Regions:
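Cysteine-centered motifs
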Residues: 5, 11-15
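Short, Lys/Arg-enriched N-terminal segments with co-localized hydrophobic residues
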Residues: 23, 31-46
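An N-terminal-biased, well-structured beta-alpha scaffold segment characteristic
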Residues: 45-152, 156
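Glycine/serine-rich phosphate-binding loop and adjoining beta1-alpha1 elements at the start
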Residues: 48, 54, 125-216
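Glycine-rich phosphate/diphosphate-binding loop of Rossmann-like nucleotide-binding domains
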Residues: 52-87, 201-253
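Generic secondary-structure signature for well-ordered alpha-helical cores
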Residues: 74-78, 101-102, 116-119, 155-159, ...
Length: 253
């Protein structure tokens, strides 16, 4: 499975010209971004952007917050949000209405009407079958480890744009880095919890207390996840060691 994507700042969502052939997807970037792709597919420039409620287990986020909806509406687009899509982040249907969105009763209504579907996590099997060749899907996909999803999306014919493959002019991953920051920090919180004796751990308090040494934390890898894990552990008072094969990276740290 091959995805090629290059992010241009100021271009939202960003990609156009995606082609699907079997399970091979190639994405090319252009100055008009997804609006150009929509024009190629439908002959229109204005989008109807759909935001379904996330249905993956333990996923509480939402594809667009009300302020993002307001920005899209200001730029001439329409937004259709499934009812209660923002409940997990404390955003009510009324807030979305105030931002200019219409509220759909079901996810089926969103998939049936939207030009672009904006999500957080990868679509589930009952969502693949609702996608069509005339639609753009913009979300995290993580296709390398999910062949069934790759085949499902290819079969739908939709233009699927993965957040995690978008790169900036410096080769960075601006839409993946925030998730890595969260993962690194939460890793230390979870690890500290499992050090407690009642969780089967050694009864070590990561910060230590007067008379008791803090925990020794080893972080393997000095990338975005590792750096944020190290920052969190240092902030909690642990003694931290980072292993990495890159000497320049270790010097930076």
């Amino acid at each position: 499975f091959r995805i090629i994507c290059r992010y241009k700042s100021g271009c939202w969502p960003c990609c156009h010209g995606a082609t699907v052939s079997g399970v091979f997807v190639t994405m090319r970037i252009g100055s008009f971004g997804a609006v150009t792709e929509l024009f190629r597919i439908t002959g229109r420039i204005e989008m109807l952007v759909g935001v379904p409620k996330e249905i993956k287990t333990q996923e509480f986020r939402v594809g667009l917050v009300p302020s993002s909806v307001a920005e899209l509406v200001h730029r001439g687009h329409q937004v259709l949000v499934e009812t209660n899509a923002g409940t997990g982040i404390g955003a009510s249907d009324d807030e979305y209405r105030a931002a200019g969105a219409d509220i759909a009763a079901t996810a089926g209504d969103v998939f049936a009407k939207a030009d672009m579907i904006v999500k957080v996590k990868e679509p589930q099997p009952n969502e693949w079958v609702q996608l069509s060749p005339s639609q753009i899907l913009f979300t995290y996909l993580h296709l390398a480890a999910d062949a069934p999803q790759a085949y499902g999306l290819a079969k739908s014919g939709c233009t699927a744009i993965a957040y995690e493959t978008i790169t900036d002019d410096q080769g960075g991953l601006p839409l993946l880095a925030p998730m890595s920051e969260v993962a690194g920090r939460l890793a230390v919180v979870e690890g500290a919890s499992h050090l407690k004796a009642n969780a089967g751990g050694r009864g070590v308090l990561i910060s230590g207390v007067p008379g008791t040494a803090p925990a020794d934390v080893l972080v393997i890898g000095g990338g975005v996840v590792g750096v944020n894990a190290a920052k969190m552990a240092v902030g909690l008072g642990a003694r931290v060691t980072v292993f990495d094969r890159s000497v320049p990276r270790l010097r930076y740290l």
